[in-house]
From Swiss-Prot:
Species of the source: Callipepla californica
GO molecular function: serine-type endopeptidase inhibitor activity
Protein name, per record: Ovomucoid
InterPro entries per record: Bifunctional_prot_inhibitor, Kazal_dom, Kazal_dom_sf, Prot_inh_Kazal-m
First-listed, main subcellular location of the protein, grouped into a coarse class: secreted
PROSITE patterns xref list: KAZAL_1, KAZAL_2
Compartmental location: Secreted
S-S bonds: C8-C38, C16-C35, C24-C56
Annotated glycan sites: N45
Lineage: Eukaryota, Metazoa, Chordata, Craniata, Vertebrata
Length: 56
């Protein structure tokens, strides 16, 4: 069983696209796309993780 993960090594980015590919974070918040999620991961100092793909 592999853990669900997203590579956030290219982040943070100053601006995200409006692409809608939702991800659910460990904070039980739905992020619109990988960019928004990864920016939040960076802001959380790595405490935020991916719960699953799709809405929470």
């Amino acid at each position: 069983f592999a853990a669900v993960s997203v590579d956030c090594s290219e982040y943070p980015k100053p601006a995200c696209t409006l692409e809608y590919r939702p991800l659910c974070g460990s904070d039980n918040k739905t992020y619109a796309n990988k960019c928004n999620f990864c920016n939040a991961v960076v802001e959380s100092n790595g405490t935020l993780t991916l719960s699953h793909f799709g809405k929470c």
